[in-house]
Amino acid sequence: MHTAIGTTLGSLARGIDIAAVRHMSTGRCFVVATILGGAALLATQATAGPIDVRNSKLTVFVYKAGLFSAFADNHVISAPIASGAIVTAPAPAIELVVNAADLVPLDPDLDPAKRAEVRTRMLGEEVLDTGKFPTITFASTAIEPAGSDRWNVSGRLTIHGVTKAVTIPVVRADRVYRGETRIRQRDFGINPIRIAGGTVSVKDELKVEFEISAAEGN
């Protein structure tokens, strides 16, 4: 199965520019990434099997800034990959979707009330505005080999109604594909949170990690 996956990735990378296929509903959330599951979804084309959404996730690291940042908190935010699709005609393409409302702070050092407050603010109009932008989407445009079980996955990431081109290095271990990239909130029309006159704030740059699992038997 893994040989077939690698062969599929390699052959597509050598000769096919993958085009985004259908207009997807725009989403707003820290990323993404999901963005990044391009390699995993493309891999499943070898057997036309789905990704394992139960074991596929997006994780975002949000960092504090400002004069009094020592009194603030960094945050780890996570959401499952909601769905993915492979289109074989008229041209090969892949898509990923994350439901923005599924994002939750994992911060173990925060009490439950504080985590709930962080999540409410994150999903609200001030940041993600999930009522208006319920999903994050990614559609691949090209995949280039970068070594053994490694690829550079390029695609279009849509957050908060803004689409940006991104390229993410992806590594495979067994059936799991992992990638990491950094994005800026302002690139997607999101103003980083600032409180107390900016003495405590969130950095514009976010680190985004993903883990995509191919379904058993595919």
Which residues does each predicted region cover?
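N-terminal hydrophobic alpha-helix used for membrane targeting or insertion
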Residues: 6, 12, 33-34, 115, ...
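Compositionally biased, low-structure terminal segments
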Residues: 10-13, 31, 69, 139
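Hydrophobic alpha-helical context, especially transmembrane and signal-peptide helices
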Residues: 28-29, 75
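Bacterial N-terminal signal peptides
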Residues: 29-41
